């Protein structure tokens, strides 16, 4: 029998959920029939999910998500959270929290934290030369050094993360959970700036340069989020969860930065993972460590299947931690609808849900 303190987290990319006539990319719109089909599919998935906390991505309109919950018959069961009151421009994240869980606080991040900087100066030759190498011509020493100078001027998220503090309305022994709902920059190449003075020179290489720009931005966003997470997680026992379309695989550099690469316990006699103050554990990895079926994916591109949508949890959800409050039960992925030529009424991403049982250490 399920304990009311058990909890499940889900991530769902809505794939451009917008009201009829509302503008999307390149002026695209839905007619009423297309909107009805999209709302019907979204509502059906919400009913299947049965998750306590859901993070959404690619939402254009508040009303569209309200309509989906109404169609699913779940309006009274969930409280919805958006990045701000009123309307917004472009796609955003949103969230839903099911009773008896409640939203205690909400916070949006747009600017990178002040501590976040991706710059590195040129190293002066005096710092490169060792005392016993003073007789070596400086130009020869410099030629053998790696040039690590960098100046990356990104200072805001492309899509604002939303942080919720989620509490239990009936149990005082359950600590509030800090939930970050995220959507990092996509892998799709960024369009080049046509006004750039070297645009014509760059144009033949637009795909490579655009992909590099997207990768750099996604890495910067992961780093900024890591800085924010560390400020919230260090030196306290606040359970923390990161949900969302992170647009990279679990072993990618993006996820390594974001998770801080905690150790997993892979055999019973190990003492690994007893403590990790600000690391985040991947529900995908936890599922893979306990099942013979390792074929998990939430996205398909040119035949390549990978997990881009993640549930990352702090040590309070890891069963081998001395600070455990919950233990991982299972990860489920709905991905039958994810095909190269998927139906526009559905999504181009799989939907993930991770369940955790209340089991304090």
Name these PLM-found stretches:
Residues 208-236:
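A long, amphipathic alpha-helix that forms part
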Residues 17-22, 188-190, 320-321:
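Short, solvent-exposed loop/turn elements at domain surfaces
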Residues 6-19, 176-185, 205-211:
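Active-site-proximal beta-strand elements of phosphoester/diester hydrolases
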Residues 15, 59-60, 185, 246-249:
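Catalytic metal-binding/acid-base residues of hydrolase active sites
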Residues 38, 42, 61, 218-221, ...:
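Stable alpha-helical elements in mature extracytoplasmic
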Residues 59-63, 67-187:
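Structured beta-strand-rich core segments of catalytic domains in phosphoester-bond hydrolases
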Residues 1-93, 199-201, 237, 326, ...:
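N-terminal, active-site-proximal structural segment of metallo-dependent hydrolase catalytic domains
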Residues 1, 103-107, 119, 156, ...:
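Metal-dependent phosphoester-hydrolase catalytic domains
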